[in-house]
From Swiss-Prot:
The keyword Disulfide bond does not apply. It comes from the Bacteria. Catalyzes the NADPH-dependent reduction of L-glutamate 5-phosphate into L-glutamate 5-semialdehyde and phosphate. The product spontaneously undergoes cyclization to form 1-pyrroline-5-carboxylate. It catalyses: L-glutamate 5-semialdehyde + phosphate + NADP(+) = L-glutamyl 5-phosphate + NADPH + H(+). It is found in: Cytoplasm. It comes from Lachnospira eligens (strain ATCC 27750 / DSM 3376 / VPI C15-48 / C15-B4). This is Gamma-glutamyl phosphate reductase. Belongs to the gamma-glutamyl phosphate reductase family. NCBIfam families: PRK00197.1, proA. Pathway: Amino-acid biosynthesis; L-proline biosynthesis; L-glutamate 5-semialdehyde from L-glutamate: step 2/2. The keyword Transmembrane helix does not apply. GO terms for biological process: L-proline biosynthetic process. Its main location: cytoplasm.
Amino acid sequence: MESLEQIGIKAKKASRYLAKLGIDEKNKALEAVADALTANAESIIAANEKDLVNAKANGMKPALIDRLTLDIKRINAMADGIRVLTGLEDPVGEVTGMKKRPNGLVIGTKRVPLGVVAIIYESRPNVTADAFGLTFKSGNACILRGGSDSINSNIAIADVIANALSDNGINPDVINLIKDTDRALVNQLMKMNDYIDVIIPRGGAGLIKNVVNNSTVPVIETGTGNCHVYVDEYADIDMAVKVIYNAKTSRIGVCNACESLVIHKAVAKQAIPLIVNALKEKNVEVRGDEYAMQCDSRIVPASDDDWGMEYLDYIISVKTVDSVDEAIEHINTYNTGHSESIITKDYNNANRFLDEIDAACVYVNASTRFSDGFEFGFGAEIGISTQKLHARGPMGLKALTTTKYVIYGEGQIRQ
């Protein structure tokens, strides 16, 4: 088995090779990878089944098993995400801001790949394909370190990708999966500044905190999702029920799922029973404050810990408020900077929410579940950044590039 240093050397060399590939070559290779994923779906599902058997034997929660599971539909979605990338404009090589200085120098910026991108992730094997597609199209080599829970699935997907690249004359070293599941290797990976340009962690709060606190390699933080939907006093109640049901129950184990409902007391007695009725169709446990419990006897008491909790389960908290100010204050206190939504017909309250909520994605009258690179038109995303430097929100191709200055002269020297 290769050492991490050997993988780093290969990836660094491959990144220089990849930076020179033209758009047509990259798109042709991506099409071949997408075709290979669908053609090898049965073998990928067979590998995934091994992971599922182990996960169930180890008592993994249903929400996490859902994240781990691959079927024909999800494999086709992975392939479609890669195909979408072929239709997107390549940001690499874009030159902007060219200006002529008084001394005759022409100075501008050129968009270039980051180099080698390492992605550390947990139980979602689709990240293997998503991460490859975005890093490859943006001219970056990748080093992938998935969780031990999904190791068989990850190996199967990475092997299919590498073989498809090789069959099409592309250096397969542009994708490097770490097959050793020893957790100590993560700490080693985080210190590989000589080979890795940036690390992107995707997973639970513990993983992200460990990488952010201990990596000497620059990190783009993808945060956990304690996402809120605020039902304003001027909300369309039917719309609120529909949006909350979708945001909470369509997929509970994802970071853009709604974990907390905030509702104005002026509409709480009318809206809460209707919302609880809908959520109970999926057996969602509803935990609320005292006023929320007065509105519906099926609500159980919430603790202070509930307000900041990312459940990833069939549980939601309900906080009642007296004003939009209180709603904004509560959300900004407990959110994780991911995705927040207001349901309202009031223009001023909508704009206040957009302006004052501190999050990567802020919605008016829509589900938080749209916080996704594919839904935003970026193709498969590398993650949703909750930090403010370099990239924020769903990260597509441009987020995986940087710029350098290009300067054209005619023999000028500095006096």
